[in-house]
């Protein structure tokens, strides 16, 4: 297989957005990655995630688990390429849970699958659920790693993105006043009352 140009695929699928964005953390950014735009094309999903499979194929994984929503398709595609079972966690009453009759065998080696890892919040919530059920989380696999800090486990990604993030009161885009702020993504903004 030839080397996968992840940035090219992100651009071709309109997943790498430029502008003025309000993130779920309440911070602002000039770029945003909307991986759902990549995942709508099965061939792009397979191609991009093949780069992640190359990094995790020797980890002796038993199970791939993706937090809903962003991790559902990612976990399925990683599981398909690895030949492993793929399931997902989801929120019920604002708490991450493993539902729908899915199970974790005690001692199972698990990779968490995400579309984008930024703060690691849903990853860590999922990790706690899986460890409470007796699983051993060996890392997180994702399309885009946007972290700027250690989340306490290895991250295996198709691409590492260094995207500037600003506190809302220090945002140069707000100060310029040229671009309206846009709220992308899917997580609710409870802290901001939106």
UniProtKB/Swiss-Prot annotation:
Residues the record lists as binding 5-phospho-alpha-D-ribose 1-diphosphate: 114-122
Pathways per UniProt: Pyrimidine metabolism; UMP biosynthesis via de novo pathway; UMP from orotate: step 1/2
Gene3D superfamilies with a match to the protein in the record: 3.40.50.2020
InterPro entries referenced in this protein's UniProt entry, alphabetically: OPRT, Orotate_PRibTrfase_bac, PRibTrfase_dom, PRTase-like
Keyword entries, A-Z: Glycosyltransferase, Magnesium, Pyrimidine biosynthesis, Transferase
Organism domain of life: Bacteria
Key word Glycosyltransferase present: yes
Quaternary context: Homodimer.
Protein name, per record: Orotate phosphoribosyltransferase
Organism in which the protein naturally occurs: Clostridioides difficile (strain 630) (Peptoclostridium difficile)
Gene responsible for this protein: pyrE
